[in-house]
Amino acid sequence: MASAADDSALGGQEERESFTIYHEGRELQLHWRGLPPLQRFPASRICSNAGGELLLLTTDHALYSAKLQANREHMDLQLLRTDVVDMDFCSGSQELFVVLTNGSVQRQATGSGRDVGHPHAWQTLGFDPLELHAEGVRIRRVCCSAQGVVFVGASGETYVMGSCGEVFKAEQQPRHMRLYEEGKELLDLAAGNEHFVMLVAPYNLADDALQLSVASAKEEPEDERASVKSISSGHSERSVAANTRHLLHQGYALLHTQLFTFGASNNGLLGSGDHIRRANVMRLQKLDSMGVCSIAAGLEHTVARTLDGRLYHWGLNNHSQLGEDVSSPMEITITENTAALPIEQNSALEATCGDYHTLLLNASGQIHSLQPAPPMRHLQQSSTYAQTLLQLQLGAAWPRQLRLLMCSGGYTLQNQRQFQRQYHYYLSHLQSQLQLLLKHRQAVQTLEIWQRQSALEPLSALGPLLINWERILCLLVATLHSLEGFYRADFVQPADLLFICHYKEYIDLFDGYTKAYCDVFSVNGFGEAVVAITGLSSPLAELNEESYVTRLFQQPFSIYQLFVQFMELLVRTQSEYGEHRVAWSEFARHSCISQELAVNTKDFWSSNDRNPRIVQFRGRHRRVILTSALVPLKLVTSGISRSSNSFILFSDFLCQVSGNSLYSYPLTTLWVWTEGDSLRLTTPEKSFLVSTRSQEMRKVWLDQLQSSIIASLGKPLGSPVPSYRSTGYEFSREHPKFSRVKACGTWRKGVLHGNCYLEYPDGSVYCGELQHGIIEGFGKMVIPTTGLYVGNFKGGRFHGHGVYEMHCKDSPESEVYEGNFCEGLFHGHGVMRNNRYIYVGEYQANARSGYGVIEDLVSGDKYMGMFADNKRSGIGSCITNRGDYFEGSFSGDDLTGSGVAVFENDYYYEGELTLLGPNGRGEYYMPSGDACGGSGAMGTGEFDDTCELIGNKMFGQLSGTWDTVRIQAGELVLNRRFPKYPSSLGRQVVDHNRKWRSLFNNFESDLANCTASTSSSGGNQSAGTLRKSSKPTLSTAQIWNCIAVYMSKQRAREGTKPGNYFNNILLSLPLPQKTSSPLAKARTTTSALSKLQTEAASALDFLGFPPRRIQSQEALNSKPGGLQRADSLISMGHNTSRDLDNSSLASFQLDQSLMNSTVNGDESSTFNESFSKLSHNNNNSISKHMNNIDCSITSTTSTTSAVLDQVPSFGMALVLTEQDVTSIRLYLEQAFKDRHHPLYVLNERIANCFHYSYGYWKVKPTPILAKQAMREWESISRRIYRFVRKMFPALPEELCQMEGSREVISHITLLYPLVLSEGIYSTLFVLYANKYSRKDEMYRQNLNLAEKLKDQELVELMGHESFLHNVMLDPKFVESVQTLKELQEKFSPQDMLTVIQRSTQLLTEAYEHAMAANAAQLNADNMIPLTMLTMLRAAVPHLGAELALLDDLTGGPNFQAEMNGMAGYCYTTLKAAYEHVTSRALQKIP
């Protein structure tokens, strides 16, 4: 279809036709009957019936009937229908078949003088009478012989009708019949009187033949099975790899086309070379893989054309159409005098067949008749179309090119085109290149067979080159197909040419071929292959000549030169293709340089073939760039050198030959710069000076070294040599720090600096940061027989916050420590978990020392107090698994001296005691009831701590056990009154401000050091020693600077995926090409590290890493040197043991390619194969510990707000304003939710401590802890607030009341709504619920009864006024009940008070609405009864504990304004209602 641009190009000459029709050699004038088409479309098919009428189908699906007028100079065209995609005429049955746009087929008989196209004469054919296809059968093509018809479906399936010899007979209706093999695509179909010819191409068979990797589903979103489809880049979003694959698939399919024939008789019509009749379809093997691109058939002969311009014909010569009978395809020429004609007239662009003649369209646009009949003879000299004809862009018609020449009966039709004749030179020369490659393809295929079957190394080395040669051949075929379409004007934009729109893919393929060729040529591979061939029986004598084999593989280099010339011509008129021209020119230059280097390298190896020390470096992938023999270079030494030094610059390393020693320095880890008149060369293990004789020579060496380094790093030529690089290296055995360590990471002038990956000879692995060659910063270390550490390092040792998972082969226990380290030891706040206990608290030099909480997982006992030297020492409290509570002074892990003991049955003791029983003077109280009478108070957890009990008392010298207390010297008195709890209770517990001191100190120290670590050098070890250090004092500006650096580091560690920091490090590491071994035994050599595959990162996922089997804490303490040596990389696991437990080895998962790859070019130096996938579970896993939401104050995470990305300006002045308070609250709300912010981290750590202290109860906790937990939480909140004040100095030190409002600002009002999360509140609530269980049990029983009663019954049972029932029916009352239910979902005091106040307000509105008729106001007499009813309907669980906890949270001056106002009144009313409800048990009235 012509585009709008084409219309404008017509320039008002719309009467111009897009095709010309000839009859018996004369051009006819076309007359359009009726309204002629506004836009002329080319013809796609013509056929003539028996009456001499011509049927013409155009590309716009219009079918015309054309009749020759009597004067034989004019032809009338009449439109029949506009929905036809294909048509053909069967001369035997006199029927016209048309394929419609909807895929259906209709036929019409045209004999007996009937007019073609009568609307009522069409008959629709059925292809699926049984309706087996859900969507029906869609036909796209029809082809007719004299008696038979073949239909082709949209999916390539074929149907037959009529008769064709023994193949199919007398089919009255279409029948499905497979005419060609499965897995092939039908490209074209032609028919004579008694035979059919099919052109087919294979589907994607190129994957195996060309060794192509199968593209992923993402790269191929659409079905591309049809291998010859267009892949124009203008309509493709595939990746480069996918485009390359499709290019080669298209070329492979076009090259490996096949011809199939079948017919009623043979007589040479089938091209089989004989006259034997065939009862089935036959393949013409002679034309296999010849690149046949089009076919045409006359009544008794057939013509085929190939992409390289060759023609073949066969058939009968009854009418002199062939010159002689030809029963097998024979190549023909256009003219006998080819040399005298221009080259455009010497190549056939298209061939077609009339009934008994063959017409050719040459590249000049001239029609030639091949031995034409006399009436057509003058066409041989004429019919060259004008250059001003309409240009057409067919779009969907390409690449199945529209036929430019068609014949039927005595008519010939030529679709007019304006050929791109200025580019014919390139078309013809590419055809010549294809002919040459096809001519020598047998030799290549012979080498391929030998290469696969022979074990000879010279032949095996040809494998990559042979594959690349086949790829270039397929690429050339696809290129010719594209260029021919452009030349014929099937498309007119040069951007649609494959070698332009896919120039990157083309250059990659040619670059691959160039490399494969140079790899073979540089090591004399062709000569060695010829020598190997001489021992084989070669069917081709030329393969015994090295010159022939070399020329054979040099031939493809002529192809891209034509592309360069084409681009040079193109940019003269269309400068927008300058980028493509530059790309092709640069590639041509680089290819020439590569070939020149290959020649030089071959000469170098030839001249040194008797030097074994040099020959060992000989490899296909290595080139010789420069030698000191060519350009002198010598080593600068301080003394007199006794041996001479020579240098050889290879493409991947610099070789130094010194006497009997030989050294190699990989270019990826080589730094070079000018130093005076010399050159300074620096490697990870050595730095030395070299000099030249002149400045020019020094520049040559400097330029070659720098360009070689750039090339080895994979950077574009001309890039500056980077001082920072990401590459790999294996240190030699002599290196003092990293002996035999394989390192891959960021380097700066020979020193590791940045993110790195280290693998040690004993299997230890480190992944993380290094500073100036020292492990310092954040990282992960896996140590066989010792454990796994993730955290901060300093000076090569654990330092700062980290997680250390220890394991031991001989111990079944597991142990994980998370906390602070100092100089490789547990020091500061930490959490130790193993199978026997959990400890949370302070450490000093690997020992528990200071305040801590330890829970015995075996016995269930919990201790909260002071430690010294791993033992309980100092004041503390112990809670047993029975719920007994001990408080006093501990020494040597036992309770000694005076203390108190409160037992689960409400007995208690004051005096000298141990954990086992009384031990000296003391008093033992045994209550039997409360002072009010009855024993109901026993064990109920009465909420009134001052309640007095009645019971017996023992005092004096007491002994025995707690089960049997004995009086040694004392008295037993009966029925005495005494308080419920000991008077000295709580006097010997650790001060709440002393608890978790190290946690806050470590937090502030880590925050202060995060900026110091970025600016300090690797050798600075002054900070962080085991000596007690002063608490860092930072100004407000310094704190904000530390917060910014901290958040930046946290985000960098997390990367794009949470917990994937180490994966991102490995993904950022280089993947250089694998190199062969230059020195397999000399460990002083170094070269490029082999590929580090990204699959290794899967084992570095910190959050998903399970713990290992480890040694106990006691075993660790028995070996203090294990974490205290000067270099933790040596101390942690670098032992001599080789008997490692692979099942529990903490290691990295590396794939097989990494295991087998080389380091420093040593093929025997592979990565440790013991690195296997870690996949066993443990209850103490790090992942569970890090993601324990129960321990989290703020379990929700959110994206970083813009508020956190800048230093705030509010809260910094001396005066605090309401706007400051609002902004501070907004900032803190975001900070406590953002996992990158230090406040979030502080929250997480302190929440863990609080939960370990007052959570994890296996039995009902003692109510004594309720008040202690509340006071401890207040202390924690106050210390968090103290740090927040450093961020916002305007905040008050204690509290203040805002001017103009009653709002109080303090740590409670500011932080409780943010940090008092579900986890903390739930922990406190459990303690309070146990303490206030008596009233809540009564409350629960009354709720159960009230739930069963109707509203009226409940009012009567409670003894309230009956009119309150009307209030309960009001919707506001129901809303009040629902609001009060929200109390159990709130955690902060302010939110809880708001819920209570809102519920009371709705209750008031319900009363006023219900009593509106009486205009009654709600008073105190009715408020409490209504509140009781609301409470019983809301049924908030453990309401007594909720109210008591709220009472403690709102105590003090912080909520004085609220408690003195409406919120306090509502709270007091609810509390009073609760007391009324629980004062007695409700009983249903009978």
From Swiss-Prot:
Name where the RCC1 repeats lie. 147-201, 256-307, 308-363
Q: Which GO terms describe its cellular component?
A: cytoplasm; intracellular membrane-bounded organelle; vesicle
- One BP term from GO: endosomal transport
Q: Which PROSITE patterns match?
A: RCC1_2 (PS00626), RCC1_3 (PS50012), VPS9 (PS51205)
Q: In which tissues is it expressed?
A: In the embryo, expressed in a wide range of tissues including the epidermis and the ventral nerve cord.
**Where does each MORN repeat begin and end?**
744-765, 766-784, 789-804, 817-832, 839-853, 863-884
Q: Known SUPFAM superfamilies for this protein? A: Histone H3 K4-specific methyltransferase SET7/9 N-terminal domain, PH domain-like, RCC1/BLIP-II, VPS9 domain
Q: Which residues form the VPS9 domain?
A: 1333-1486
Pfam families to which the protein is assigned, alphabetical: Alsin_RLD (PF25384), DH_alsin (PF25389), MORN (PF02493), PH_alsin (PF25383), VPS9 (PF02204)
Alphabetized InterPro entries for the sequence: Alsin_GEFs/MotNeuronReg, MORN, RCC1/BLIP-II, Reg_chr_condens, VPS9, VPS9_dom_sf
In the UniProt record for this chain, what is stated about the effect of gene disruption? Deterioration of locomotion in adults with climbing ability strongly depressed.
GO MF annotations for this entry? GTPase activator activity; guanyl-nucleotide exchange factor activity; small GTPase binding
Keywords annotated in UniProt: GTPase activation, Guanine-nucleotide releasing factor, Repeat
Q: What does this protein do?
A: Has guanine nucleotide exchange factor (GEF) activity towards Rab5. Promotes the exchange of GDP to GTP, converting inactive GDP-bound Rab5 into its active GTP-bound form.
Give the protein name, as stated in the record. Answer: Alsin homolog
- Please give the organism: Drosophila melanogaster (Fruit fly)
Q: What is the lineage of its organism?
A: Eukaryota, Metazoa, Ecdysozoa, Arthropoda, Hexapoda
